Amino acid sequence: LSGEVMKFGEDFKKSKKALSIYANKLMTSPHYGEHFARHWLDVARYADSNGLDENIGLGNAWRYRDYVVNAFNADKPYDRFVVEQLAGDLVPNASHETIVATGYLQLGPKVLAEPDIEKLRLDIIDEQLDTLGKTFLGMSLGCARCHDHKFDPIRQTDYYSLAAIFHSTKTIGNDTMGAIKFW
């Protein structure tokens, strides 16, 4: 890489067009998607397991990771990228790719040992909303689950309005087991 940087510096001294040439080279590289996807995957709380005490492997999490890498490499429009992750199963002509994109909602830490299925559902929704707020609004929504803050723009009523939408999303597999339905 350092050799490439040196070569770019030399080429740039000769011609300002070098910037455009090198930018195009970098953006058409398959490594472009890998590099920038890692930032999105951090925000989306990507991991190959659910973390926490159980640390159960998410056998198909890689599909979501590959979806994100491919989306960056294909220069997928941001609005489409977001819609597919939040409702890829509901878009017209939903495909395997758009359904895999909903892995965004499946990822993240979950206490799968929680014996109370309804509490587990609500905790998952809380985690999804908190991630949604941090990802798309740049703010935490978690506090509004319990109370209003004097200076926060999200009130409890707003929180539970959003939670109602996510409550209709099936993220729990077999209700008697309490296990996450892995996509």
Regions found by a protein language model. Give the residues of each.
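Short, structured secondary-structure elements
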Residues: 1-183
